[in-house]
Amino acid sequence: MAEKVGEGKASEGEKKKNKFGKAAKVSLGVLGGLSLLMGYISAAGMEESEREEEARKPIDTFFTALNARDIEGCRRTLHYPNIQIAGNEIIILDDPESFQIDFQLLANEGWTYSTLDSCSMRQSCNEKVHFEVQLSMHRANDSRYATYQALWIVTKLEGIWGIQCRSIFPSGVRST
């Protein structure tokens, strides 16, 4: 029986077409999978970035309130109990009234304002972020007279981000 052209055996051109067609389908499948994976990675990075941004707000607000000499504003940025660690001294503040700043004492040493020189997220999860912080104290002539390295821990309690712990390293450069 005679075989019709196009039936049974594929021509060389059709074989190449099918070969490249399979490769293209596999490539598209791999690219689609990678694209999906990159979307997940991007979404996770965006979620972490948004968490860092939200968790950092109480730190920025704390410095704004501090420089305005607004003790109540500072208190509102903290979660209680609040832990302060300076050197090896640990202070636990049970309520907002426990948090005090002696602005007169600071003024007597020449303090006019403080700056948040750097604030970098080091670790995070959905409800807690660790920030490595560098802060400085300045005189009226803008000269810096003290710089401190610190670890600040910000937590999310009942949907609100607040500073839970401030640990300042005693190695700050302080000139008088």
PLM regions: where:
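Generic beta-strand structural signal
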Residues: 85, 123-124, 156
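A mature extracytoplasmic/lumenal domain signature
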Residues: 78, 88-89, 125, 133-135, ...
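Juxtamembrane low-complexity tails/linkers enriched in Ser/Thr-Pro and polybasic
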Residues: 6-18
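Surface-exposed, charged secondary-structure patches
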Residues: 97-145
